[in-house]
């Protein structure tokens, strides 16, 4: 039984990686389940045993990346000296390092930013992406709340605006890097952008409640 469960998990992982490669090559809307099954070297029936549809597969892939990031955050928290605000900085720096060095993270975010077509056909996939993005907004809000409590940030910080500012900065940097054909050195640029962003969160009056 244990061997069967292990084999099933390996097959599921193999299917997710096949989906990642196919989505990366063709985009989500133009990829069929049959193409994913062929890329994985399994029957369509075997794919359906693990995933109900393409949206279910994308959701599992999204969750896999989120779990990886969560594990890295936990490791950063264990390794870093200081509170959640310091950990947040380390987490962001490590995220952009992985974006360049980890093939799975690179391809997934490339799909998310460039190949996740906003069409009626793709509505369910877009809804899944928004669901996960909402979860990360909540996590960022929690980081800001703790930073305020620890006096790393001002007690009159406008957290709603701050979350929008953070997401806009980070998403904008990722999109710009991908859409420009990686025309600038992300390894040099990301730490500077993160530093500017965090300095503004700590000091800029426009991020305080009116």
UniProtKB/Swiss-Prot annotation:
Q: Name one GO molecular function term.
A: DNA binding
How is loss of this gene reflected in the phenotype of the organism?
Answer: Deletion of the gene results in increased resistance to antibiotics and detergents.
Regulation of activity: what does the record state? DNA binding is affected significantly by increasing the NaCl concentration.
PROSITE patterns on file: HTH_TETR_1 (PS01081), HTH_TETR_2 (PS50977)
Q: Which residues bind DNA?
A: 32-51
Q: Does the keyword Chloroplast apply?
A: no
Query: Out of the domains of life, which is the source?
Result: Bacteria
Q: Where's the HTH tetR-type domain? A: 9-69
Record keywords, A-Z: DNA-binding, Repressor, Transcription, Transcription regulation
Q: Which InterPro entries match?
A: DNA-bd_HTH_TetR-type_CS (IPR023772), Homeodomain-like_sf (IPR009057), HTH-type_Tx_Regulator (IPR050624), HTH_TetR (IPR001647), Tet_transcr_reg_TetR-rel_C_sf (IPR036271), Tscrpt_reg_MAATS_C (IPR013572)
Gene3D superfamilies per UniProt: Tetracycline Repressor, domain 2 (1.10.357.10)
Other notes? The MtrA and MtrR-binding sites are sterically close and addition of an effector increases the affinity of MtrA for the mtrCDE promoter such that MtrR binding is negatively impacted.
UniProt function note: Controls the permeability of the cell envelope to hydrophobic compounds such as antibiotics and detergents. Represses transcription of the mtrCDE-encoded efflux pump by binding within the mtrCDE promoter. Also negatively regulates the expression of farR, by binding to its promoter region, leading indirectly to the positive regulation of expression of the farAB-encoded efflux pump.
Subunit architecture: Homodimer. Binds to DNA as a pair of dimers.
Q: What is this protein called?
A: HTH-type transcriptional regulator MtrR
**What is the species listed in this Swiss-Prot or TrEMBL entry?**
Neisseria gonorrhoeae
């Amino acid at each position: 039984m244990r061997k069967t469960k292990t084999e099933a998990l390996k097959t599921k992982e193999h299917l997710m990686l096949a989906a990642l490669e196919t989505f990366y090559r063709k985009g989500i809307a133009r990829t069929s389940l049959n193409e994913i099954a062929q890329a994985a070297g399994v029957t369509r029936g075997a794919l359906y045993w693990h995933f109900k549809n393409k949206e279910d597969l994308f959701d599992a892939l999204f969750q896999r990346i989120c779990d990886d990031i969560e594990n890295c955050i936990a490791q950063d928290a264990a390794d870093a000296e200081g509170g959640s605000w310091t950990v947040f900085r380390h987490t962001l720096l490590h995220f952009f390092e992985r974006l360049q060095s980890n093939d799975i993270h690179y391809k997934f975010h490339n799909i998310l930013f460039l190949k996740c077509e906003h069409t009626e056909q793709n509505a369910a996939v877009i809804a899944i992406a928004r669901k996960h993005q909402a979860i990360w907004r909540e996590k960022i809000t929690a980081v800001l709340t703790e930073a305020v409590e620890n006096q790393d940030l001002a007690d009159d910080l406008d957290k709603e605006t701050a979350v929008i500012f953070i997401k806009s900065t980070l998403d904008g940097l990722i999109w710009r890097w991908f859409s420009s054909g990686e025309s600038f050195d992300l390894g040099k640029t990301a730490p500077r952008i993160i530093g500017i962003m965090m300095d503004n969160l700590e000091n800029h009056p426009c991020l305080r409640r009116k």
